[in-house]
């Protein structure tokens, strides 16, 4: 018999190993580990924890800050709501959100309203991360989290060059980038 779903906590199954191998083959670089979660919210929470653990393992335990983006939605859990930029969620749950989260501006500029595909302008918005790193100290920032395409606010595609610029800034400051 076959189960529809089994929580893969501390155990593995043939199908999960097969899927992990297929995913690894389709990703760039030398990805050799896959971590399954039960939903997107849990995936975000896990990614945040992995970032903190990664920096602690490297002797950089002071890296506790996260940078999100305005209008972003990353899930319903506390960490995901904290790094998300949905203003009503932030206002409603402000007293229990994670400290040390800062938000960059969103990438949906007024001139992008009727643009199909990737807008030509706006890549410089990624420089918000550079300014945040200077203001708060890049040595204190664990990761930056963005939706490559923002689905919660109308399927907003980032400007050309934005994600590449964000990657460059993260690399410059040793900040992890979560998609």
Can you say where each PLM-predicted feature lies in the sequence?
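A glycine-/small-polar-enriched, mobile loop at the entrance of the PLP active site in fold-type I
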Residues: 1-17, 150
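Short, conserved phosphate-binding/catalytic loop or strand-edge motifs used
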Residues: 17-20, 145-147
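Glycine- and other small-residue-rich loops at beta-strand/loop junctions that grip anionic moieties
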Residues: 8, 12, 36, 155, ...
């Amino acid at each position: 018999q076959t189960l529809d779903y089994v929580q893969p906590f501390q155990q593995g199954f043939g199908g999960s190993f097969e899927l992990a191998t297929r995913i690894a083959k389709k990703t760039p670089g030398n990805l050799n580990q896959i971590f399954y979660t039960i939903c997107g919210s849990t995936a975000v929470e896990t990614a945040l924890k992995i970032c903190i653990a990664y920096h602690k393992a490297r002797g950089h335990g002071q890296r506790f800050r996260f940078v999100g983006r305005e209008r972003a939605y990353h899930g319903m859990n506390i960490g995901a709501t904290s790094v998300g930029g949905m203003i009503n969620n932030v206002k409603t749950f402000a007293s229990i959100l994670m400290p040390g989260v800062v938000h960059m501006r969103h990438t949906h500029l007024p001139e992008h309203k009727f643009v199909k595909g990737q807008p030509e302008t706006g890549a410089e918005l990624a420089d918000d991360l550079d300014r945040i790193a200077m203001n708060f100290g890049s040595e204190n920032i664990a990761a930056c989290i963005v939706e490559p395409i923002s689905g919660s606010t109308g399927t907003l595609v980032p400007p050309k060059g934005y994600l590449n610029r964000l990657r460059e800034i993260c690399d410059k400051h040793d900040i992890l980038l979560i998609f």
